[in-house]
Swiss-Prot record:
Its EC number is 1.1.1.40. Its cofactor is Mg(2+); Mn(2+). It catalyses: (S)-malate + NADP(+) = pyruvate + CO2 + NADPH; oxaloacetate + H(+) = pyruvate + CO2. This is NADP-dependent malic enzyme 2. The modification N-acetylglycine is found at residue 2. It comes from the Eukaryota. It holds the Pfam family Malic_M. It is an enzyme of class 1 (oxidoreductase). Keywords: Acetylation, Cytoplasm, Metal-binding, NADP, Oxidoreductase. Residues 1-21 are annotated as: Disordered. NCBIfam families: PRK13529.1. Signal peptide: none annotated. Belongs to the malic enzymes family.
Amino acid sequence: MGSTPTDLPGEDVADNRSGVGGGISDVYGEDSATLDQLVTPWVTSVASGYTLMRDPRYNKGLAFTDKERDAHYLTGLLPPVILSQDVQERKVMHNLRQYTVPLQRYMALMDLQERNERLFYKLLIDNVEELLPVVYTPTVGEACQKYGSIFRKPQGLYISLNEKGKILEVLKNWPQRGIQVIVVTDGERILGLGDLGCQGMGIPVGKLSLYTALGGIRPSACLPITIDVGTNNEKLLNDEFYIGLKQRRATGQEYAEFLHEFMCAVKQNYGEKVLVQFEDFANHNAFDLLSKYSDSHLVFNDDIQGTASVVLAGLIAAQKVLGKKLADHTFLFLGAGEAGTGIAELIALKISKETGAPITETRKKIWLVDSKGLIVSSRKESLQHFKQPWAHEHKPVKDLIGAVNAIKPTVLIGTSGVGQTFTKEVVEAMATNNEKPLILALSNPTSQAECTAEQAYTWTKGRAIFGSGSPFDPVVYDGKTYLPGQANNCYIFPGLGLGLIMSGAIRVRDDMLLAASEALAAQVTEEHYANGLIYPPFSNIREISANIAACVAAKTYDLGLASNLPRAKDLVKFAESSMYSPVYRNYR
């Protein structure tokens, strides 16, 4: 039986029943209800006073002016001092720098995001190089591993197998309606850390905070989602703090039907133009989902396509340093999963467009090594379908050093997810075969990188052109300072997403990824080359994203896949004007 007030709201009602916590003004019965009675939760609808201060979208903390405090019933609820947003930013950065443990910084930033959204994004935009490793790789990996223990407040939408048949209803529970970007994971392959199940939510949350900070997409237009189909991680299944379903992963038809219901519900609820980014799915599901929905939805896989685009940009930029065209290189990959095959395919496509050779021929410039050795034609029948295009004629080679010595690559790319696999012997062999070996150790987080920047420069006697997935500090070798490049997907996906949104794209095509790569490479200056960089610094990432967005949008219009008409005359200015600003608004 529900607890229904017998007097009119607003009147003082005394309830002197013993054993319950009622009292004066308990008109809705929340305090006087016993455990077996139902209570209706309610909130005020006007954002003022205490409610306004607790709403992260509108809260300004001590930046509320005297006029705003009077108008919105805040007087007395805040100390009398008024601080500008810039002063607040300096204060938060000062406090963050007191933490010596990166996870503590991560937790403090997530707390700020839940408390004061605009201050969080201003902080991230103005201090991107310092804070990017905190809100994303490598710290987000540790955060996901410990997500159950540090969990304070839900972020994003959780859709579990329990909701099968009613996913559309669950989507409608999300309070924002104008969603433009969804980042979704099932938690099976989080970075290089494996199956973290429901605790993978840290990845969509982190990715979307970067869509806003780096690409200027409104926070209210972003939706992080975790699909919980169980986990095969025994440690999590036995962890009392684990926040997900404690059951083995659904697979096969059950999994496919659940994901199909999700994709249909997304399109029904948010329309044709919502961008769905698949994030950290296991290889077999990642390729299948991208293939299945690329012709019916606006979908993008950052692990396959985003990584490919940013790596290709680095290779295009490196042409000036190496004096070689892409077609003149021989590429060797360690790792033949989502990232490795995705990068390889985009490189082959770029060479094909430059030379006019069919892609079946340009693929022969690219070799892949997996856990069983070099991928060659004699293994083709036993290979997964996404590896088969890379099975070339060659005698079997069992390990990486054997492949380096046999193939003699000019470019070595690591996407294995296994740290320290570019051994001294491997790197020295690259240096023996090349005057300036190009070495990209792309696996995340830092602990899983195939080699460190210091190792690459030391073992090649300072001759390597090095890039990594996670950040490394500058390296001093033989009296010279080397600045490692970071082949970070953050260069690509924010600008790509903005370009798709501002053009009203209805599908993603490889030509758009090529456009993003070329736009990024074009922003590497002679000064950057002089410092050994093949990527521009992150300090002007919003300018980079605007240029990428403009090129992606232009390609979308050229392909006839844009729905926002007419086309803006100056797409760069349009991109810049479309970006979310975290500066505080003035309230009436």
